[in-house]
Amino acid sequence: MTKKFFPVVRSVWIGLVLFTFSVFMICGCSKKQKAADNTAQKVVRINYQTGTLCAAPVHIAMKKGLFEEELAKIGQKAEYVNVVEGGPTLAELIGSGKVDAGYGLYATQLQAIENGLPISYTSGIHTGCTKYYVRADSDIQSVKDLRGKKIGVPGLADSSVMNLKRKLLDVGIGVTADNNEVEFLAYSSSDLAIALNNGAVDVIGAHDPVATRGELAYGFRKILDTGTDEKFVHEYCCQQFVTHKLLKENPEGAAAVTRALQKASAFVEAEPVEAARIQIENNLVSGDLDFNSKLLDELDFIPSRSLGKKTFEAAAKQLQVAGILKAETDIEKFVKTGYIELPGVPDGYIYDSEKGKYIEITEPRA
């Protein structure tokens, strides 16, 4: 063996040692990074609105710490995103990745979901809350008399439009593009009652508390109430949703916020006066305690995943007939992806006021 060979061997040996050390350091850093990622506390961003009485479940879940409690069980926490009138819409906040979960009028988002809004619903929260009025001197007696009429609504994609179109279909009044026998006009919620009173429209559709306040202030006559009408009385108007990103990256968080909102809804059902007090005292909703609590008491806040899905499916099928959803949309697939069952989430809850405990509803309500 020549002397020249030893430097070569030595160089190779040193190179192997350095390579092995580098691999060890990279693996060690990678493991540390993964450990840091695993221990980092995840945050679920939840939308809420002020001024909306039937948003009571979200308000209660926030103020009674139900979101924090459920998320803390899995080492996570909640943050809240206020959706304000005149600002970015809920759909825009979802699309820009600023909201992970929340609650609202599900029918308002059906077209957006069909067009790619990445959310799925996980539970029905409450029924009712949308009402339709005419002036006291109007010759309109029911939905059957609405052919050729102007209808004021909070928005052309609002659930008040979707619900009424379904009802109009039932009584034979055209609502499709090629046979449209009514005209919907959009107004801000605060201007709806004025528009009806001034004769700019023949009918208005509004959500409480705006609806009932307008009725009392102007003496309007109610022709349809989704809280009592036989078609809608067992259908949810407001439902819980989660984004597809949350479902993919944090399914445990999605389940936690769903349970929290179900519990909060059950609390409102059992304690409407206390729920109204919490809303007013925290400046989440204005108004009188007696007035607000009576409106909450009129609504059905018993949550249900099964009945929520049944509601979603019924609306999707009929709104396709109405031309709201595309004729080529596969409704079965639309429902399957638009409404999901999360592991660890019961069908719903009831709240035992005497014991201060939440009891799981295991049997499907639908």
PLM regions and their residue ranges:
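Flexible hinge/capping segments at coil-to-helix
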Residues: D37-N38, R135-I151, V175-A177, K248-E252
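Short, well-ordered beta-strand elements
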Residues: T39-A55, Q76-N82, S120, G148-G152, ...
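Ligand-binding "clamshell"
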Residues: T39-K42, Q111-T122, L169, R213-T228
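Short, polar/charged alpha-helical segment
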Residues: Y48, T52-V81, G95, Q111-N115, ...
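Pocket-flanking alpha-helical
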Residues: C54-A56, A61, V84-I119, K131-Q141, ...
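Pocket-lining segment of extracytoplasmic ligand-binding domains
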Residues: A107, S138, D178-E181, L185, ...
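Secondary-structure end/capping motifs
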Residues: E249-E328
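Conserved C-terminal helix/tail region of periplasmic/extracytoplasmic solute-binding proteins
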Residues: Q320-A366
